[in-house]
């Protein structure tokens, strides 16, 4: 009876119901409904995200966000404090840049582009941190895009970064942006177990 009723409906419509259901199943197999909902929410929330250049008023935010994520897994190292306590002197005055992500007007993420004194690498992408309550909105990726765009403005050729494979969302973002893992690893931090590079294309 159900089959007959469905066939009657199919005859009364322009599209074959079973074909439509099959197409839905194919699309959902490629990407789940939950994933589609998350992506739609992320796109909607991006309207409330803005990246601005660093100002001294964000010094405490720059430090606190970085301390927060580092101490979740590791300890703060002296090399960290050089940059976190003195961002103007150690990053900006040396030719680098810091970016601050605002969500609904509040600072929730930071990222630095540090000028490198290196024969191969022009800048290091570093100090990327997003407040836990603001994670999942694509803010980290947006900050990375801002840093890469600035590097392009500065005619940089290759970017460098150091991270840890425990930070799976961050590693996924870096790979999505085109960063490739380096075969040799000479970490500047104890927590560093992966180094990557991005060859910028114009």
Residue ranges of predicted features:
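Short, solvent-exposed amphipathic helices
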Residues: 1-12, 16-23, 27, 68, ...
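Conserved N-terminal entry element of GNAT/NAT acetyltransferase domains
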Residues: 3-9, 26, 30-57, 200-202
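Acetyl-CoA-dependent GNAT
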Residues: 46-49, 53-126, 131-133, 144-146, ...
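Conserved beta-strand-loop-alpha-helix junction that forms the acyl-donor binding cleft
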Residues: 135, 160-170, 187-191
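Conserved GNAT acetyl-CoA-binding A-motif
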Residues: 151-163
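Conserved active-site tyrosine of GNAT-family acetyltransferases
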Residues: 174, 179
């Amino acid at each position: 009876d159900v089959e007959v009723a469905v066939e009657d409906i199919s005859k009364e419509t322009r599209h074959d119901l079973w074909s439509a259901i099959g197409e839905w199943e194919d699309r959902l197999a490629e990407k789940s409904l939950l994933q589609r909902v998350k992506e739609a929410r992320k796109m909607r929330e991006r309207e409330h995200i803005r990246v601005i250049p660093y100002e001294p008023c964000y010094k405490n935010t720059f430090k606190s966000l970085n301390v927060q994520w580092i101490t979740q897994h590791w300890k703060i190292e002296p090399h960290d404090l050089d940059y976190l306590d003195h961002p103007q002197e150690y990053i900006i005055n040396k030719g680098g840049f810091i970016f601050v992500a605002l969500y609904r007007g509040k600072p929730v993420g930071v990222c630095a582009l540090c000028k490198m004194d290196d024969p191969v690498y022009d800048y290091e992408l570093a100090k990327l941190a997003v407040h836990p309550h603001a994670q999942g909105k694509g803010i980290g990726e947006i900050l990375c895009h801002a840093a890469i765009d600035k590097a392009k403005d500065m005619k940089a050729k290759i970017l460098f970064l150091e991270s840890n494979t425990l930070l799976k969302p961050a590693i996924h973002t870096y790979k999505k942006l085109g960063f490739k893992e380096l075969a040799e690893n000479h970490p500047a931090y104890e927590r560093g177990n992966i180094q990557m590079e991005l060859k910028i294309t114009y």
